């Protein structure tokens, strides 16, 4: 067998792991007999994007930091290799006209899409991250103001953000008042993303946009 120990692992081995993650989908096809023992037929390895690989390496570094914090090792090799910053594509936005078209769309025959539409429009109105959106409760609403601590920055800068709520945002809150524990219905992030796409298709918003292919690193 093969074992890694936190007190002896070297930076080179972290980089070897990264190379394995990058090429795992190739190894899966080249050595099918080896991978049979893991029963991966339903979820075979696929080529990962640079963003996914960066995320995995950050999590691995977190494990190294945890081992140091817990006193298991003084080996700081987890800090001796570079993790590149994620490359982001050029953002694109709905126009005000498109946003209002979505807000005013009649989706009564598809109530699930109504929920995704309301979540999306509310998030657009307050400018919060998805994780913050699904964490809000009634306690975050003070009059017509949304107040919250952004999760991404609360450890570095514990500063409350205050966002005045527009008429549209207040109307959305009234639709869900008292219907759930959170301020608004919650969804898994992947469900939310798919739901937004479905809403836009239903509303006929399908213009071409340029996005970054995070696997190839090229805009498509």
Where are these regions (language model features)?
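N-terminal core-binding DNA-recognition domain of tyrosine recombinases/integrases
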Residues: 1-90, 105, 109, 178-179
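DNA breakage-rejoining catalytic core of tyrosine-based enzymes
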Residues: 7, 73-75, 85-104, 155-167, ...
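Short coil turns linking two alpha-helices in DNA-binding domains
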Residues: 48-49, 129, 188
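Short, leucine-enriched amphipathic alpha-helices that occur as contiguous helical runs
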Residues: 56, 99, 115-117, 193
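Short, charged phosphate-coordinating catalytic segments
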Residues: 64-76, 123-145
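Conserved tyrosine-mediated DNA breakage-rejoining catalytic core shared by Y-recombinases
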Residues: 82-86, 126, 135-175
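C-terminal catalytic core of Y-nucleophile DNA break-rejoin enzymes
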Residues: 88, 154-220
